[in-house]
Amino acid sequence: MTDLDAMTLRNAYDHQLRASVPDPLPAGVTVDRDGPLVRLLGLDHGGFLTYRDLDGLTGAALDGLIARQVEFFRARGESVEWKWHGHDEPADLPERLRAAGFVPEEPETVVIGPVAPLAAALPVVPEGVRLREVTSRADLDRIVAMEEAVWNADRSHLATGLEKEIAADPQSITVVVAEAGDEVVSAGWVRYVPGTGFATLWGGSTLVPWRRRGIYRALVTYRARLAAQRDRTLLQVDASDESRPILQRLGLVPVTTTTPYVYTP
């Protein structure tokens, strides 16, 4: 794919996804705005800030916008993530965020590619493993147990968040587990973003003994098929360094990077 194609995909991402808001919203989640920023509140893991662009704000005006977010979430006593992208302007935004108390976490690469070729591939899993779509809280809790084993961190908010999304609009998200017997060995979900050509892929954590056996790839192709059934034409993933090479081999293209900047009161 040419640089021009990658730029076209990035433009589609900027205009269709970056400021998109779930409709209907999950229970307890609200949205408001501060200038160019879209603020999501009531999420199970804190607030979230996104935007298509910053309307050309620089210098003191930009510092003022950042300071208002710090004060807003300090008053609420909750953390907030500012989702920064590598092509965002102005270029000094990361240092301004750090100066205001935001801390960068691990960067990821935004990759995008066409649904059709992936949807045409058969999901192939190792013998003894099956893929299954799930909606129950019991299954979501099993996903959390797998995630906590992988990351050695509390992931309980994940089950609550997914449960609320499914309850708000079961047609907007599908959660898929890879199981070996009674054990969840990997899981991922796909969101069908309304009013766009995009489906977005999330999750993908896999227990160590089951890695490098094609399960992650199978989950990607399975969810691509679900996206094709819903007339989505593009897949988007915030890819870790581990998953990015797999996704690139499957035809997805890096278009930018993204880094969570987190403020914690």
Where are these regions (language model features)?
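Conserved acetyl-CoA-binding loop-helix of GNAT-fold acetyltransferases
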Residues: L62-V70, W202-V208, R212-Q229, A239, ...
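Acyl-donor-binding surface of acyltransferase catalytic domains
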Residues: A61-A138, V237, T259-Y263
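A conserved beta-turn-beta hairpin within the catalytic core of GNAT-like acetyltransferases
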Residues: L40-R52, Y192-L201, R211
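A conserved beta-strand-loop-helix scaffold within acyl/acetyltransferase catalytic domains
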Residues: R155-P209
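N-terminal charged segments
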Residues: M1-F72, E89
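Conserved beta-hairpin
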Residues: T30-P36, D92-V103, S172-G188
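Short amphipathic alpha-helix that is part of the acyltransferase structural core
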Residues: M1-A19, A60, E108-V110, V115-E165, ...
